[in-house]
Amino acid sequence: MSTQIDPRGPRFGAAITSTLLAVTVFLSLDAATLAASHALLGVISVSFLWGALRGPANHPYGFLFRKLVRPRLTAPKELEDSAGPQFAQLVGLLVAGTGFVLGIFGVTAGITIAAAAAFFAAFLNAAFNYCLGCQIHVGLKRLKVIR
């Protein structure tokens, strides 16, 4: 059973993630900073892994949100099930992790493409409150592919 979370928490995390992914894309465009972009994509992949395994409430960004941001906000109008955002973290892990592994095998364009794709999804969530991974989760539940 998943927990109920403040829906603003994952958006806060998506804002941090989209910033890191934008830096990753920028660094991946120059051969001199390609190694740094690869390392940063690895760190982001670990962050996605943490969120996929532990859920958004137990993610470091969730901790930062609870301690630094939420006390300054009014109570949320409603809570959301954490299953969708947790699934979105898994999708992020698959995308970013693929780019990281491709980078290990010398496919450096994979770093840029994966980081850009993950940035697109994270930015949609942060800026427009549209969680692409959550929508995939809902679609797969409707198709009865997952529970």
Short names for language-model regions:
Residues 1-147:
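Membrane-interfacial helix-loop segments of redox and metal-homeostasis proteins
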